[in-house]
Amino acid sequence: TQSRSSAASDVYKRQDINLFIEDTLRAGQYKNKLEYVEILANESMDNIESMINYGLNLDKEDGKVAFTREGAHSINRIVYSKDTTGKAVFETLIEECKKRKNIILYEDTCLIDIITDCDKCIGGVVIKNQKEIIICSKVVVLATGGIGGVFKNSTNQRHLTGDGLAIALKHNVKVKDINYIQIHPTAFYEENNDNRKLLISESVRGEGGKLLNKHKERFVDELLPRDVVSKAIFKQMKMDNREYVYLDVTHLDSEYLKSRFSFIYEQCLIRGTDITKDYIKVAPAQHYFMGGIEVDLHSKTSMNNLYAVGEVS
């Protein structure tokens, strides 16, 4: 634990909190709530340290936590675990939950409604093995994820259809900015695939990947905010009369690519593209639901005893 905490301290030393806040505000066109952004930036290091202590393995350079860069960030400040950071975070948290005797996990269980009494949430109704189960609780937390499953092109799993949001709307729980939907610039283009799109991580561009049109010419700064890059790609696709543009990483060292982006390399290879030699066909796809159930700084919704966290909020 000591060595892991020290690694997180190294992260903190290299982090410029004020610049992080400004980058976030600028990318959000200053529509963000400053107080919320300040908390995000100031608590980020503590959260990373907690994850390291839980057992999250982050990539390192010279024994210290490594950083990459993504869109709208003015410096390298993104910590990562190979090219499957989200999966690593998820698995680390699941393992931590399994250790807690006060947490009971119900897998393959679907929430279909919450139970209310006098504008107070007192439980939920779930389906498991085709059986309806009523769970009563003093507090209910919605963490049902996003809405990507309703889009033809999305990097999300198909089962993410906004169920938590629908339940909140049914009970007149306040929502906010539900028209704010993030379109990721670079999902792997497959002509006849209506399933979940393979995300080509933004860090690929952060490590030097270049976006090219059909003439193999760059047409945008790859590290502008995602909405700006996506709009530029859509515009270029229309000009090229194509459903994709190219992402080129062939100028990068092949062994580095195979190591740093092992998952993307393997998945593209399965789909017939060797990223060390071939241009990657990419197109924008729905990625993240920016709006959701309105909450305060403690994740409390407009309904008593009901909270919301994560992408649904």
Indicate residue ranges for each PLM-predicted region:
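Single conserved hydrophobic/aromatic residue that forms the stacking wall/gate
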Residues: 1-8, 12
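A short alpha-helix-loop-beta-strand transition element characteristic
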Residues: 31-38, 48-66, 104, 174-177, ...
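A glycine-rich dinucleotide-binding beta-alpha-beta segment and adjacent secondary-structure elements
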Residues: 107, 112-127, 260-313
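Glycine-/small-residue-rich beta->alpha transition segments that form the dinucleotide
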Residues: 137-139, 143-148, 312-313
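An anion/pyrophosphate-binding glycine-rich loop and adjacent beta-alpha core
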Residues: 167, 173-280
